[in-house]
Design a protein with these regions (language model features):
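Start-of-helix register in tetratricopeptide repeats
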Residues: 18, 54, 90, 126, ...
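TPR/TPR-like alpha-solenoid repeats
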Residues: 26, 47, 62, 83, ...
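Hydrophobic face of amphipathic alpha-helices that form TPR/SEL1-like repeat modules
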Residues: 22-29, 58-65, 69, 94-101, ...
Length: 419
């Protein structure tokens, strides 16, 4: 495209705001003329000083981003305020963001909310999404799920991917609206089409489970792959599972290990755990107990309760690591406090035997009581053997301790511990 720079510059020099804006935009993107941020800034300032809300809003955003100018939130707010007062919705939304984050001004959630409302009423999709978020989380306003879904849906209808995902979540869970799996899946799909990884991941789960759509392993695989290639760790992990079990794709342990490894690089505990299982079971690699133990250790250190229990078993047996009952007990405790019933059971047994920690029937009974959530006959049998060695006062203390553990860690709340 040929630009008549002389004519456009003459018009801009004469005070033609539209010419000034056009010239500023051309210099900013280098369209038809060499890119020149200095000239772009010069013409945006000219138009802004003549009262152009569009130029004022753009100047504000340039100062926020530090593009062509030093980053300066105070100056950004000055220009955004001028444009916002002229009902420029993009300026109002940006100004709201500054108040929300406390950038260039004191943080003021109430003022941020008010500016988002003004921008949203003028049709700004981002402001509508932020209003939905604020209502959904009681952020700067009383929580109101009905208002949240209303604003999310308005933004979603304008093609805002995050709003589409959140609207989908609310329809799937029936929050603020009647539960509607089909509508939830529809919004996941819209967001997924925009390349939004979390939506692609959710859509894959929808197809895998047949929730709101016809169950389809191939579609589940397709969308997990999309999300995984966008770097979403949960999708990378799930894609590994699909390859491992041959769901929607031929079983391929090498591909499973590849995707588990990528998820593990983002410190995803479940991925470390699966890598440990693959090395322990010789799936796609030689059986290697030492390597397996290393992965279980990493999974356990990331806080994954299942791995903490498994690592405890390895230390108990000296499998891939040196036998260490005290370390085993430490890992059982960590898993037990997260509600892992197997760890609770084994910890109870260890307290009864004094293996790796002190012999303590009260603590043994307390953990065995909590492990009853698993409804395992063996667990009940062991509990009976332990209580047979205790008097009524000790049993009362054990029940009291179990109740305190429930309250402190918020675990195994289905188990009724009668004090």
């Amino acid at each position: 495209m040929t630009v008549d720079l002389s004519s456009l510059t003459a018009d801009a020099d004469s005070g033609d705001i539209e010419a000034q804006l056009q010239l500023a935009e051309l210099y900013e993107i280098g369209f038809g003329i060499p890119m020149d941020h200095g000239q772009a800034l010069y013409w945006y300032r000219k138009a802004a000083n003549l009262g152009s809300a569009k130029a004022q809003a753009h100047l504000g955003r340039l100062f926020i981003k530090g593009e062509g100018v030093p980053e300066d939130y105070v100056e950004a707010i000055r220009w955004l305020q001028l444009a916002a007062d002229q009902d420029d919705p993009s300026a109002q939304a940006s100004l709201a963001w500054c108040y929300q984050k406390g950038m260039g001004t004191e943080r003021n959630i109430k003022t941020a909310f008010e500016w988002y409302v003004r921008a949203a009423k003028l049709g700004h999709a981002g402001a509508r999404y932020n209003l939905g978020y604020m209502y959904a989380n009681g952020y700067g306003v009383d929580r109101d799920d009905r208002m949240a879904i209303e604003w999310y849906t308005k933004a979603a209808e304008q093609g805002h991917p995050k709003a589409q995902l959140n609207a989908g979540l609310m329809y799937v869970q029936g929050i603020g609206t009647t539960k509607n799996l089909e509508e939830g899946a529809r919004w996941y799909l819209e967001a997924a089409k925009h390349g939004y990884a979390k939506a692609q991941y959710n859509l894959a789960l929808v197809y895998a489970g047949g929730h709101g759509v016809q169950q389809n392993d191939k579609e589940a695989f397709r969308w997990q792959t999309e999300a995984a290639h966008h770097g979403y760790h949960r999708a990378q992990f799930n894609l590994g599972l699909l390859y491992m079990h041959g769901l929607g794709v031929e079983q391929d342990y090498a591909q499973a290990m590849k995707w588990f490894t990528l998820a593990a690089k983002q410190n995803y505990g479940k991925a470390f755990y699966q890598l440990g299982k693959m090395h322990a079971g010789g799936m796609g690699t030689d059986t290697n107990e030492i390597e397996a133990a290393k992965y279980f250790q990493m999974a356990a250190e990331s806080g994954y309760a299942k791995a903490q229990y498994r690592l405890g078993r390895l230390y108990d047996k000296g499998q891939g690591v040196e036998c260490d009952h005290a370390l085993a007990a430490d890992w059982y405790k960590k898993a037990a406090r997260q509600g892992n019933t197997r760890a609770q059971y084994v910890l109870g047994v260890h307290y009864a035997r004094g293996q790796g920690l002190e012999n303590n029937l009260i603590k043994s009974c307390a953990w065995l009581l909590l492990s009853q959530e698993a409804n395992d006959p063996l667990y009940r049998e062991v509990l009976q053997k332990v209580t047979a060695r205790m008097d009524d006062e000790q049993i009362h203390e054990a029940k009291k301790l179990a109740h305190n553990i429930q309250e402190e860690y918020g675990i195994n709340l289905k188990v009724r511990v009668n004090q």
